[in-house]
Design a protein with these regions (language model features):
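Short, mixed-charge low-complexity intrinsically disordered segments
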Residues: 12, 43-82, 117-143
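Generic structural motif
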Residues: 11-13, 38, 83-85, 104-106, ...
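Short amphipathic alpha-helices within nucleic acid-binding modules
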Residues: 38-44, 107-111
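Mixed-charge, glycine-accented linear interaction segment located at domain edges/termini
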Residues: 98-128
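Hydrophobic beta-strand residues in large extracellular and virion-surface proteins
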Residues: 6-8, 30, 78, 101, ...
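Short N-terminal helix-initiation segments at or just after the protein's N-terminus
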Residues: 22-30, 40-47
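Short aromatic-glycine-(Arg/Gly/Cys) micro-motifs in beta-strand/loop hairpins
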Residues: 1-28, 69-95
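A short, exposed loop/beta-hairpin motif centered on an aromatic-Gly-Thr core
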Residues: 24-36, 93-104
Length: 143
């Protein structure tokens, strides 16, 4: 599975029933199969809510990233450095991974990340945990 961040401009209805173009675009995290166009998933999702056609401004593939399944309204991004020892050579191998976590607060996201850490092998260090401006996580053709 691949993860991509898709930025889309959309005209939405606001509280006064007037239509408004979303300024800088909305960001969506899309989990998709390799080779699939993640922008199409966002367009399909947003089209019923948009007055005019949705414009995809950009798509960026998130390498070395995964989603931690959790509940919450805000999406956080954690950068974690993993350290694994090669038993044949005795060398330590370090790699960084990004984890996207739903939570209502930093502590919720941190606890969800630590729960996920029970499945990891080797040592790890949480380098950063920050709030993102991603609106929603979409799953496209993920069976």
């Amino acid at each position: 599975m691949n993860l991509s961040i898709v930025v889309a401009k959309v005209v939405r209805e606001n509280a006064q029933y007037k239509y408004k173009l979303v300024g800088k675009g909305e960001r969506y995290l899309v989990q998709h199969q390799e080779g699939d166009n993640s922008g199409n998933a966002v367009m399909k999702y947003l089209t019923p809510y948009a007055k005019e056609p949705v414009v995809i401004e950009g798509v960026s593939l998130q390498k070395h990233s995964e989603i931690v399944e959790s509940f919450g309204e805000v999406i956080y991004k954690a950068v974690v450095q993993h350290v694994v020892e090669d038993f044949d050579t005795g060398r330590l191998h370090k790699s960084k991974r990004n984890y996207f976590i739903n939570g209502d607060s930093y502590s919720d996201a941190y606890e969800s990340l630590l729960a996920e850490a029970n499945n990891w092998v080797g040592l790890f260090e949480i380098i950063s945990l920050s709030k993102t401006n991603i609106i929603e996580v979409l799953y496209d053709n993920c069976n």
